[in-house]
Amino acid sequence: MGIPAFIKQVKEEDYVILPGDFSWAMYLDDARLDFKYLNDLPGNKILLKGNHDYWWTTIAKMNNFIKENEYKNIYFLYNNSYLIENKIIVGTRGWNILDTENNSKMIKRENARLELSITDGLKRFGNDKEIIAFMHYPPINKNDVIGNEQTEFAKTLKKYNIHRCYYGHLHGPSHKDAVEGNIDGIEYKLISADYLNFDLLNI
C-alpha cells in the first residue's frame, strides 16, 4: 500500500487499530521518532502490544509519554477498551500457544488481560453492543481445530459472545499456519501487514 495510499484512505476522524510490533526500540524514550511518524499520519491509532515491543511499559508511563510529547492521536489498548462506531474494541497481546515451556503461566496471564479488557468494555459501554477482539498472537492454531479443542482465549471469546477476532504475528512462510474463517461461531482473520499486502482492512 505505502504511505501515500494510507494518507489517501484514512481520514482524521477514522480509527486505525495496529495489533503490535511498531518499533525496534528497547525503551520508550528511544521510540520517539516512531511515535512521531505515527502521530503525523492521519487518523487515530490504537496500539496493541506485540512480542517485539520491548519499549512497552505501564499504561501510566505510556500515557504520560504521549502527553509530554504532544502526540494527539495515539492510544493504547491495554486492560481497557474503546467504543468506536457503536462497537466495543477489546484486546491483548496473547501468547504463543505452542510454547509448552511457558504456556500455562503466560497464557493464563494474557487471557486474564483479555477478560479485563472485555469486562471494562461491558462496564463502560453496556452489553447491548458488538464486541470485536484484537490480539497480536493467534488465539488458536490448526491443531486445535483438527482436534476440536478450544484454547483459553477461544473459551473467553465464546464466554462473552464475541464473534470476530483479528490477529497478527504470522509473517511470510508462517502465513500457512493461520486459522481463518468461522470456528465454533467466531470469525478469525489474520491481519499481519504483509499478509494484507500492506493494505488496510476495513473492519
Please give the residue ranges for each predicted region.
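Core catalytic region of metal-dependent phosphoesterases/phosphodiesterases
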Residues: 1-84, 147-160, 186, 190-193
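Binuclear metal-dependent phosphoesterase catalytic core
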Residues: 4, 105-106, 112, 119, ...
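Small-side-chain structural scaffolding
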Residues: 14, 19, 23, 90-94, ...
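Receiver (REC) domain switch-region micro-motif
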Residues: 16, 131-133, 165
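Active-site environment of divalent metal-dependent phosphoester hydrolases
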Residues: 23-27, 51-59, 81-83, 96-100, ...
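Generic alpha-helical propensity signal that fires on short helical segments
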Residues: 34, 61-65, 100, 107, ...
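Generic beta-sheet signal
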Residues: 48-50, 92, 134, 168, ...
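Conserved catalytic scaffold of divalent metal-dependent phosphoesterases
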Residues: 58-148
